[in-house]
């Protein structure tokens, strides 16, 4: 179970960071801990339940309000699918997509599985790199990714930021 308070820790941190940094853009990837068994005011939130989805959707909107407080555009990566299908990443993606759609202009969803997934967007542990070598994308539990996965995501973001005029392609 997460050891933080949503309003006092998370939202306060988001607000403080935006106020201190005044970001030109905000980049977000969250969701790996959304299956850890949250309790809200004594109510256990079963991952995948309707109530769980309602709470996460509300929190996604609250987070977005903090990130967009000074008008910076938000680039939100979808939560990468994980090896263990008990991690209901497709449910999370639906919540994140609904949030980005609701906020409209200035909020962009980036599909992490375009670069981390196989040709159909499904989970994969390894990939063949540009040198023809088989390299690991994910760490042992199939949740977090190795540097090569992070590099793929960074390139995906860079391409989008160039396309949107935030960066200049050398």
Where are these regions (language model features)?
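Surface-exposed acidic, glycine-flexible loop patches that form ligand/cofactor-binding
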Residues: 15-21, 65-66, 166-167
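Catalytic His-Asp segment of secreted/periplasmic serine-dependent ester chemistry enzymes
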Residues: 81-170
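Conserved SGNH/GDSL esterase-like catalytic core that processes O-acyl groups on lipids
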Residues: 1-54
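Extracytoplasmic/secreted proteins, especially bacterial periplasmic and envelope-associated proteins
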Residues: 9, 13, 25, 47-51, ...
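Loop/turn elements at helix/coil->beta-strand transitions in domains of secreted/extracellular proteins
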Residues: 21-26, 69-75, 103-107
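Active-site segments of SGNH/GDSL-like serine hydrolases
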Residues: 29-39, 63-94, 111-113
């Amino acid at each position: 179970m997460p050891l933080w308070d949503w309003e006092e820790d998370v939202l306060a941190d988001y607000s403080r960071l935006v106020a201190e940094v005044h970001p030109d853009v905000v980049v977000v990837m969250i969701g790996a801990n959304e299956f850890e068994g949250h309790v809200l005011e004594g109510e256990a939130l079963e991952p995948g339940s309707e109530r769980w989805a309602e709470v996460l959707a509300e929190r996604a909107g609250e987070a977005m309000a903090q990130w967009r407080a000074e008008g910076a555009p938000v680039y939100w990566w979808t939560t990468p699918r994980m090896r263990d299908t008990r991690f209901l990443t497709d449910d999370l993606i639906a919540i994140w997509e609904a949030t980005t759609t609701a906020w409209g202009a200035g909020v962009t969803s980036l599909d992490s599985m375009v670069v981390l997934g196989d040709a159909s967007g499904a989970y994969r542990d390894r990939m063949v790199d540009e040198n023809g070598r088989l390299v690991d994308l994910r760490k042992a539990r199939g949740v977090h990714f190795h540097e090569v996965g992070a590099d793929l995501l960074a390139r995906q973001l860079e391409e989008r930021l160039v396309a949107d005029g935030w960066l200049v392609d050398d």
